[in-house]
Amino acid sequence: MISRQRRLLLAGTAAAALTPRIVLAQANPGVTATELKIGTTTSLSGPVSALGTINKAQGAYFKMVNDQGGVGGRKINYLILDDGFNPAKTLEQTRRLVEEEEVAFLFSQLGTGPNSAIVKYVNDKGVPHLFLSVNGDKWGDYKTYPWTLPFAPSARTEGQIFIKYALQQNPKAKIGILYQNDDLGRDFVAGAKDVLGAQYDTVVKAASYEVTDPTVDSQLIQLQSWGADVLISGVTGKFGAMSIRKVSELGWKPQHFITSGAASVSSTINPAGPERAVGLITSVYMKDVTDPAWENDAGVKAYRAFMAKYFADGNPNEFYNAYGYMTGMVMHRVLEQCKGDFSRKSIMAQANNLKDLENPLLLPGIKVNTSPTDHRPLEQMQLQRWNGKQWERFGAVIQGAAV
């Protein structure tokens, strides 16, 4: 029979063996023996509240992960705070997440303005600031923002891809760029310079507009008069429809590219007139879950099953829900790679260690890659052309230029 003293000794040894794990969990913000607490800010109210569904879909994805046992022996607690797309509120809510809630990291915060308000704060604090819902290229600046990672291809990458394809079709092309005079538009210009280098000044003419301008007619007339046979519209919102309509009215027939952010059928193509947009080219990196071509695709079917079970109130045909599901899946992969070490340093190291990661909602051939010196996870896209009724993908996946 084991003596009382021997039982106490064994119990003490077992407790000592468990202590390092308990201390480690307490030492890492957001981590307990049973929970991993993470956080985000988004627009659940305000002018772009519809985009809040991205984070709701992610929350539903993490619920599915928890039902399947969690990650690293812990359940994910995803805190979603409303900032109303107000940068000052974003900073307030982010400080609450970091200083009061003590989250392990921040995930998929929405918007250029809101993220600009917090990026210095979170980098100074050493808090992983992962897979932002933004499209500006500055977020890939790993030297300035080592704790920050965007996700979607930037406008700069898209500009590179448009230029590469245009030159492949016509090496002597004269390229006109219509761009919004902000970070988004300037990213398109930067993308052209990345590809063309010293040739840029001789083969490109760029014309900018302000978001307050009533039209972009004069800029387009200027580019046509210069002799552009390729037109890249680095525009947003109504200016996409305006550029399509004016090019048609001018009887101008350039090879016309438009940013994916302004390629919506409902807000751009239909207001311009579907027949005016025939031949228009844009880019894409995700499967369109509403496209009959993907109806029997295993990844899309799994997404629809997920929506039915875990986010029944959400619209399965909504792009932003598919995006939320996909980014949730990528974040899940990062956490799995941590192998139970959820220190902020470990989480950032694994976010910087994605190698040719495939995702069931990415187009075939498009993969996620990161490293400590590559904070642009997606740098590949495929082109698609408007046929008068719908977008049709064509050609191979194109890689952006090395920057």
List each model region and its residues.
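Immediate post-signal peptide segment of exported/extracytoplasmic ligand-binding proteins
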Residues: 25-38, 72-75, 167-172
